[in-house]
Regions:
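Small-molecule kinase domains that catalyze NTP-dependent phosphoryl transfer to phosphate-bearing small molecules
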Residues: 93, 98-155
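Short hydrophobic/aromatic-rich motifs at helix boundaries and adjacent loops
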Residues: 19-23, 43-48, 66, 86-87, ...
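ATP-dependent NMP and nucleoside kinases share a basic, alpha-helical "lid"
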Residues: 50, 54-105, 111
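Amphipathic alpha-helical transducer elements in NTP-driven molecular machines
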Residues: 36-47, 90-93, 136-139
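Active-site-proximal flexible loops/turns
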Residues: 1-5, 70-71, 136
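Conserved substrate/cofactor phosphate-moiety recognition/catalytic segment
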Residues: 1-41
Length: 155
């Protein structure tokens, strides 16, 4: 997406992605992501590309920040004819905010804004916690879930 379409510094971007100030359920100031019509089109196109690739027998890992049950539902509908393992990636809010600050290239307040929306009413096949477990432990959990799914198909 051309950079001029987006504004990640807090200004307006009516066509693309941008941050908008808001307040979270606990009263803290946050930034919510806003998607304009071009950003929405890109998001829909990502699903179309995923369908094309899986229909051609490609295995995919799709890393998408889907905002709650509606957006996850769009993915589930798009990929309903294919085997999918939906993994929710979580971490405590204080750790998420610390990571946001340490990265240095994030709009502070965006992580808190996403925290309260991303997993809202979403049921995953597997959840992993990137703070409570190591990368290696989470990889093993995902591999185990895939293995169990494959074994259940053979029964």
């Amino acid at each position: 997406m051309p950079e001029k379409i987006n504004n990640w510094e807090g200004g307006a971007a009516p066509l693309g992605f941008s941050w908008r100030p808001a307040v979270d359920p606990t009263g803290h100031p946050i930034y919510k992501i806003h998607a304009g019509p071009f950003a929405d089109k890109i998001s829909r196109t990502l699903k179309d590309v995923a369908i094309l690739l899986v229909s051609q027998q490609y295995n995919l890992i799709i890393d998408d920040v889907a905002f709650g049950i509606l957006e996850v539902g769009e993915w589930k509908q798009a990929l309903k004819d294919y085997p999918v393992l939906y993994v929710g990636v979580t971490t405590p809010l204080d750790i998420l905010e610390k990571r946001e600050r340490l990265r240095g290239n994030r709009f502070v307040g965006g992580a808190r804004g996403q925290y309260f929306k991303v997993h809202e009413n979403v049921a995953y096949d597997l959840e992993i916690d990137t703070h409570a477990q190591s990368l290696e432990e989470n990889i093993e959990k995902i591999k185990q879930a895939f293995s169990e799914r494959e074994n259940s198909k053979q029964v």
